[in-house]
């Protein structure tokens, strides 16, 4: 029999909160104090509740975010979403690890396709204090 990671309700609450405008107080209650976020906006992870909240709220204020599905595995949960700003859209996944208290301890975020992901990062970089990227292609 397959067992699943506990506290799926935390991830479902996270998704509901993001759909509701990323309320800071609600999110604070489900993020661990030392939460780490690995994401597509920067090469370096964001560490700590306040830094992660700032990034989440910046993205939530600027983009149309729609979560499609929450998946649960043996040790992690994942939330599949679509993120859009103007004519730039990416499909993505939040890969979430919860601590023993059921709080979000680690989030890794992936976006695709790459060209749209780079364009999305350029839309959001200034909002969260990151350097905008540029996609360079090699032609022969």
Predicted regions and their residues:
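C-terminal and inter-domain tail/linker signature
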Residues: 1-140
């Amino acid at each position: 029999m397959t067992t699943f990671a506990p506290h799926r309700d935390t991830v479902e609450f996270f998704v509901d909160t993001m759909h509701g405008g990323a309320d800071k107080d609600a999110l604070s209650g489900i993020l661990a104090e030392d939460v780490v976020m690995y994401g597509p906006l920067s090469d370096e992870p964001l560490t700590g509740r306040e830094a992660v909240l700032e990034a989440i709220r910046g993205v939530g204020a600027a983009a149309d975010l729609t979560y499609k599905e929450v998946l649960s595995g043996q040790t992690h949960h994942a939330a599949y979403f679509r993120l859009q700003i103007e004519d730039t859209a990416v499909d993505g996944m939040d890969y979430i690890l919860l601590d023993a208290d059921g709080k979000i301890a680690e989030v890794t975020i992936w976006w695709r396709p790459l060209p749209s992901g780079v364009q999305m990062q350029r839309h959001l970089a200034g909002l969260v204090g990151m350097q905008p990227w540029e996609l360079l292609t090699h032609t022969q």
